[in-house]
UniProtKB/Swiss-Prot annotation:
Regulation: Inhibited by nmolar levels of AMP and GMP.
Organism the protein comes from: Mus musculus (Mouse)
Protein name per Swiss-Prot or TrEMBL: Metallophosphoesterase MPPED2
The keyword Hydrolase is annotated on this UniProt entry: yes
Family: Belongs to the UPF0046 family.
PANTHER family per the UniProt record, alphabetical: METALLOPHOSPHOESTERASE, METALLOPHOSPHOESTERASE MPPED2
Free-text function comment from the UniProt entry: Displays low metallophosphoesterase activity (in vitro). May play a role in the development of the nervous system.
TM region(s), chain numbering: none
Positions with a binding annotation for Mn(2+) 1: D65, H67, D86, H254
Amino acid sequence: MAHGIPSQGKVTITVDEYSSNPTQAFTHYNINQSRFQPPHVHMVDPIPYDTPKPAGHTRFVCISDTHSRTDGIQMPYGDILLHTGDFTELGLPSEVKKFNDWLGNLPYEYKIVIAGNHELTFDKEFMADLVKQDYYRFPSVSKLKPEDFDNVQSLLTNSIYLQDSEVTVKGFRIYGAPWTPWFNGWGFNLPRGQSLLDKWNLIPEGIDILMTHGPPLGFRDWVPKELQRVGCVELLNTVQRRIRPKLHVFGGIHEGYGIMTDGYTTYINASTCTVSFQPTNPPIIFDLPNPQGS
């Protein structure tokens, strides 16, 4: 597998034979392809906040999984904020408004947000099913009327909201998608395999920065308590073999906070909350050279 250069030509990703078992997939590809081993794949130390931004660069501030616990977060200097979902507990409009107010007080030139599995009201199909089931799993959501959440994303007036869509800011093409492998039936959950691959196939080539809620296989996706990898195999194959972004930012797995690289793409798990839901993981900053002509 080539490292350090973008893939050439049209690449078609198919469902991986180990799709349903990410831990087995990791072991197989590590043994047979050295796919997750040094020198290409390694941990990356975070940039200290007092590091001067290089000339001709844009500084990104990455956070995720704040879960309505933003009051004590110390936000560093930067140009563009990236939040990769789970900014609420249940996606209640009151939570979204509070988050939007917090965003409004931040000084970043652009603030880009995607949903996570906790933003229940942002997932229209999920909410339709929940109504049919009489809200039995999420009784606090039952107090909402459909008109309260039909256009809940419009409450995010202080950010750019992405859902299977892209935006270009300061010359960077940024794509965002909320989907994650099924886990206890939360929002934006899909079965591993073709269902998720169909979503990843929507991501166009030429993206500079990919925002997803969950991790790809093998990069900050280890859950120690379960002794399992939980990242998406199809997402990994899409990122490494087809899209080749400069930066892939995600969260979802609180235990996986940190930075890795495969020699071409930098992977950032920016989960702010720990596994015990304490918002103590600091935001991660990352500098990228400005695209030519921007």
